[in-house]
Regions:
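FAD/FMN-dependent oxidoreductases across multiple families
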Residues: 35-78
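Short, charged, intrinsically disordered terminal tails
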Residues: 388-410
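Glycine-rich beta-strand-to-loop/alpha-helix junction loops that act as flexible
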Residues: 81, 341-342, 362-368, 386-388
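Glycine- and aromatic-enriched mobile tails/lids
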Residues: 4-10, 60, 66-80, 84-128, ...
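Short, glycine-/Ser/Thr-/acidic-enriched flexible segments
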Residues: 24-26, 59-60, 66, 72, ...
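Hydrophobic alpha-helical scaffolding
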Residues: 19-30, 52, 64, 93, ...
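Acidic/glycine-rich phosphate/pyrophosphate-binding loops and surrounding catalytic core
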Residues: 123-321, 326-334, 338, 347, ...
Length: 410
């Protein structure tokens, strides 16, 4: 209809068309459109006796502003819902007449997306940076710069101030901007990074995320290491968000595991939190998790739980990994606080959950991915852990482009 109106206006060389309300009937017009009747009367039009000139509002031409799953537009931090939004639920030709229920659903998603930035984990503090982060970044830089960057030294013999742009090449969730900046700062404290995004933001293909200014030699030497961190962390955050969104209508807490890249755990677990997941254990001192080999070493589930309580009485909770129904029964009898159901069939999961009957918290684990999490998310458990959040997430494609000298070249 909007297209037909637009074509008619083009044909008539006018900025309006005529709408005839008379076939509706006076009583119905007065009942349903009292404000239109009053407004037209003020302008000298009698809707009961003549057609009136009209033009569709801009969003009717557009079919609404295009939004994503969370009602987010292409403009940073701008959301659109209802008649202003084109969400694609009913196809690309759907105009702005979104239903109330549809609007409520997308409003809820928008609200949840807005609050994520306030729930995002804090960045690394100065102490953490100095003691835990900087040594890892410096080690990574030494992999690339053992003595000199021969390529850069070949074309840049002297210092020259320059600028390069951080460009997003695919849609995703950005994470690790502080580490990206820190990588350059460890090479040269005078490097300046101006960000146009924050950790946890949705970013889109072609979007400018940052401008980095400094000695061009430093920018060239540090770009690969800085991008490696940022791409890896953003990839994990993006995949975690995908999985977390599948659990949005549940109370389940999504957990990561210790299946991380050696020497990169601090970065990868931070990225999981940015994506909406939670950290399980950061390291072996964070809690008791009795797995199959611990149980084998102890002799039984019962002995393992008792030995753990005797050795670490201050530990708040003891978790036990089980693989069979007999192990489930033994873990419950032993007083395990959390029971991890590992690599179980759907039938065995249901049987085990029914048997536990809230006598312990329940975690499901074992090859859980975005593709199969729907199989277990409605079983009434407390946690779902997924090693895939860190070991199977692909990088987010990002690039440093358009390096150029500032104020000419010496």
């Amino acid at each position: 209809m909007a297209e037909a109106i637009f074509k008619q206006m083009e044909k008539d060389q006018t900025d309006y068309v005529y709408e005839d309300l008379r076939p509706i009937g006076k009583e119905e017009i007065e009942s349903h459109f009292p404000h239109i009747v009053e407004h037209c009367k003020e302008k000298g039009y009698d809707v009961f006796k003549e057609p009136i000139p009209v033009v569709p509002a801009q969003h009717y031409f557009m079919g609404g502003i295009k939004v994503d799953y969370d009602s987010h537009t292409s403009m940073k931090h701008l959301y659109a819902i209802g008649e202003t939004a084109c969400n694609g639920v009913h196809g690309k030709n759907r105009l702005a007449s979104n239903s109330l229920l549809e609007s409520l659903v997308f409003a809820k998603r928008a609200a949840k997306d807005m609050t994520r930035k306030y729930e995002a984990p804090s960045m690394f503090d100065k102490t953490t940076l100095k003691l835990n982060v900087d040594p890892l970044i410096l080690s990574a830089l030494r992999e690339d710069i053992t003595s000199e960057d021969v390529s850069t030294c070949s074309v840049m013999r002297t210092a020259q101030l320059g600028e390069v742009e951080l460009i997003c090449k695919e849609n995703g969730i950005i994470a690790g901007l502080q580490i990206f900046e820190r990588t350059f700062k460890l090479l040269d404290e005078d490097v300046d990074v101006h960000f146009f995004a924050h950790d946890g933001d949705k970013v889109h293909k072609g979007e400018l995320l940052a401008k980095v200014t400094g000695d061009m030699r430093t920018l060239l030497e540090g770009e690969r290491t800085a991008l490696n961190y940022l791409q890896r962390m953003s990839g994990i955050a993006t995949y975690t968000r995908k999985v977390a969104d599948l659990l949005e209508d549940t109370d389940i807490k999504l957990l990561d595991t210790r299946k991380t890249t050696p020497n990169n755990r601090i970065f990868e677990k931070y990225a999981v939190k940015v994506g909406g997941g939670s950290n399980h254990r950061y390291n072996l001192t964070d809690g008791v998790l009795l797995k199959d080999n611990h149980i084998g070493a102890a002799g039984s589930v019962t002995k393992a739980v008792q030995m753990a309580r005797d050795y670490a009485p201050s530990v708040r909770k003891i978790e036990v990994e089980v693989e069979t129904f007999d192990m489930v029964k033994e873990a419950v009898a032993a007083g395990a606080d959390i029971i991890m159901l590992d690599n179980m069939s759907t039938e065995l999961l249901k049987q085990s959950i029914d048997y536990i009957d809230k006598r312990a918290e329940i975690e499901i684990s074992g090859n859980v991915t975005a593709e199969n999490i729907n199989r277990v998310k409605d079983m009434g458990v407390d946690f779902i852990s997924s090693g895939a959040l860190t070991h199977s997430a692909k990088i987010l494609d990002l690039s440093l482009k358009n390096l150029h000298a500032i104020n000419g070249r010496d």
